[in-house]
Structure formats: structure tokens, C-alpha cells
Amino acid sequence: MKEYRVYLERARSRQQDFLYPLIFREYIYGLAYSHNFNRSIFMENGGYDNKYSLLNVKRLITRMYQQNHLIISANDSNKNPFLGYNKNFYSQIISEGFAIIVEIPFFLQLSSSLEEAEIIKSYKNVRSIHSIFPFLEDKFTYLNYVSDIRIPYPIHLEILIQILRYWVKDVPFFHLLRLFLYHFCNWNCFIPTKKSISTFSKRNPRLFLFLHNFYVCEYESIFLFLRNKSSHLRLKSFSVFFERIFFYAKREHLVEVFSKDFSYTLPFFKDPNIHYVRYQGKCILASKNVPFLMNKWKYYFIHLWQCFFDVWSQPRTININQLSEHSFQLLGYFSNVRLNRSVVRSQMLQNTFLIEIVSKKLDIIVPIIPLIRSLAKAKFCNVLGHPISKPVWADSSDFDIIERFLRICRNLSHYYNGSSKKKSLYRIKYILRLSCIKTLACKHKSTVRAFLKRSGSEELLEEFFTEEEEILSLIFPRDSFSLHRFHRNRIWYLDILFSNDLVNDE
């Protein structure tokens, strides 16, 4: 992002705080090209010079103003070898350019705030997924109810642009952005459909992510204002968690954990203790509220979305459950609260008392049924969880087949090592192990038993169970590390940069 700062300073020297002139600077689209399209399938064999022309970008922008629907003429086809991809290719180039340009002022504002707060540079690789870990590690001592909330979408394009205009005062830029979204993305309907949003997000991932993050950022800022008005407890702020590498830190107070800090003073407050966390389009609101107050928060959210964002949200999209009786799903985990009861004998003079202490613990469980469903969809097992062979991999070498299965197993183990109960994870490993053996036997046209007896692959396939433990034994001192401790403790890996497919299926 250092080059972004240079480009913005260069533009400010010509026109103060205006983003519109940057649209016609070739280096912006050069950055967009190198950022996204070097990974494109149909462009990976070519270079920048013969695939992209700023002149064509300017022509398309001119036609946007003329409302010619970006039709490429025959003369243009002689100059550009990508006749069939002209509209898609240059629309994505312009979309990337818009995303880069509109990110610049927000990134500069964010970086300056982090410098003022003396945030160390090592935090730049922290993602918002890491903010979930304190939530999942909390004891939930004073929390009784949980609200499972889905942030409604789609939101209309005009609302997004109006929100952005509060932050960036550049009318020509937003006028051109509006034209682009209407012509390229088919957002000319009164109410955008989920199908159109999905198509737009796939074709323009960076711009869509920016618009969605800004919408969520605005919603959370209003929610936090309401929360501050309802409680005397100070918020614990985590402002360094990034949704992406280059842009969007959670504005303020991303995760609010109070029970440890206020365990003694909490009963003296009448206002509720709120525990809030969000990732992607789902958020969890846990509180020590009576059902009436939780329903009050529920209708706060509904009226906020309907009145401020013009997004229709129905009460059934927000579920309120008692923690001791219900569970919830977050980040691909299945979570519930377990009550631990213990009896303490207390003696005062000659009288003896038995005191029953009830403590709460959040259990993070691997969702076995959705995982088996995902494995069945990928043809590793059937719907009942019985392992099957993977014939499409039979053309590969034995080493490549084993390495593919090991990679999947490592990724699952890496992601779900924070689980408090790992039996389901071991079952998934067992399915993958047998699927690998059956695939190798299918390749060699043999039965599983005959293949194992002939090749002696049992020891090699033990890596599915032993590799993770060997790695941890190198990290921890041998005198303090034990297999029992490995099974019992939860370990969160900070190199988890994205969630698995189960998060999107919830």
C-alpha cells in the first residue's frame, strides 16, 4: 500500500482530495491488472502489454456516459485479440481500479490512526478471523441468552453510494461508479436479487468486498452507539483485526469481553453485559438479559436495517435461545454451553455446609454431519460416511495421491484443532485414510487387504494420525508435552487466514 500513498499524494498535488482524476491514470489499472488478472485462467499465458490498453478503458468509460452499453466495435476487435472477453475483461479491470481508488483514503486514514496508537507493524497480518478466538475461549460465566443474527442482504446500490458519499466528497467519482454498477453489474432493478449479488461478487470480488465491508462497518458503528447508551461498562477495543490484507479494519470494539474484568462488580449494574462477535454475514450477541430485553435488541436491529438501510428484515431471521438449552454455529464450529457442577464442603466452627457451584464452559465441537456431507460431495465417502475410492486421482503417482490426502487432512486438523472434543476430527481422518488406501488399491487393481500386505503401506499411512503430534512435540518441551495434554487442550493456529466451506453453508 505504500505505492497507493504515493499515487494519492500525486493526485492531491493536482486536485485536492479528489479521486476522479485517478480513474484516468494508467498506473491504477496496472496495479489492478497485476493484483487480479495474473491469476486469471484465460490470461495466464500473456503479458501486460498485449492484453491491456488504457485507451480501451477510456473508451469504455466514455461509452458509459453515452449509454451505449459498452459495445465493442469491429475496429477495436482488430487491435485486441480478446474479442470474446472485451466486456468482461475490461469491466473487471475497471472494477479493480474502482476498488483500489476508493480504498486509498480509507487505508490512509486507518494507517494514520494505527501510527497514532503506536500499533506495531507485525499486526498487519492479523485477520478478523482471529478475533473469534477470544470469543470462543471465553467462559460465558455471566451470559444466559444468545442471539443468532444473520446480517440481511442484498442492500440497494443507491444506499451504498449514499453512505460512501458521507466519507468521500467527490461527486464525479460516485456518478461514474453508479453508471458502472448499473451498466456492468445489472443493478438497474429496484430491488437487487441474491442471484445478481452473487454474480457481481464473483466477477468483481474486490469491489464487492469493499462495498459489503463498508455496509457492515456502518451497521456496526450504529449498533455500538446504541450499545454504549445501554450499558455503563466500558468496551474492550480490538481495532487491529483486518478483514483483508490491504483494507478494512474493524472500526472499534470488534470483540467485547467483560466477564473476566468485571466479575466482582457486575451484579451491581442493572444494565446488561453484552458479548458481541461477527464474522462475514453472521454475528452472535450473547447477554445476561431477560428474554424481554433480548427481544428489545432484536427489534432494534430490525428497525435499524429497515429504516436506515432500507433492507427488509423479518423477526424470524434473528433467533434468541437460552445458552444452557440450545447451541449455535459459528465459523464452521458447533458450539454449546456445558454446565459443570461441583460440590464444595465448607466448615464454619462446628457446622458443615455443602455448597454446589455451577460453572459454564463453551464446548467447541467439530460438526461431524456437515463434514461428512462435504466429504460425500467431494466423493471421498458416501452419505453414510463409508469411505470410497477416488478414481479420478488414480492416474497420479502413489506419492501424489498420498500427498493430496495428507494435505486435506492437515488442513482440516489445522482448522479444527481449537475444538474441545476431537473425536469427530479423528473420524474424519479415518475416512480420509481409508479413502486413500482404497484409491491406491484401485490404481493397482487390487483389493485393500492385498495391497496393504504387498506394499506395506500401513506405516506410511500412519502419518494421518501422527504428523500433528510430532509437530507439537517439536514446539513444546518434551518434559511438558504429553499426548494426553494434546487431546485435552485447544490449540488455535494464527496462520488460519480464511474459513472453510462449512462457514458458507451455515
Curated annotation (Swiss-Prot):
Cellular component GO terms, alphabetical: chloroplast
Protein keywords: Chloroplast, mRNA processing, Plastid, RNA-binding, tRNA processing
Keyword Chloroplast: yes
Broad class of where this protein is predominantly found: plastid
InterPro entries: Domain_X, Maturase_MatK, Maturase_MatK_N
Gene Ontology BP annotations: mRNA processing; RNA splicing; tRNA processing
Pfam family, one: Intron_maturas2
Keyword Lipid metabolism found: no
Membrane spanning residue stretches: none
Single annotated GO MF: RNA binding
Cell compartment(s), UniProt: Plastid, Chloroplast
Family according to the record: Belongs to the intron maturase 2 family. MatK subfamily.
Known role: Usually encoded in the trnK tRNA gene intron. Probably assists in splicing its own and other chloroplast group II introns.
PANTHER family, A to Z: MATURASE K (PTHR34811:SF1)
Listed name of the protein: Maturase K
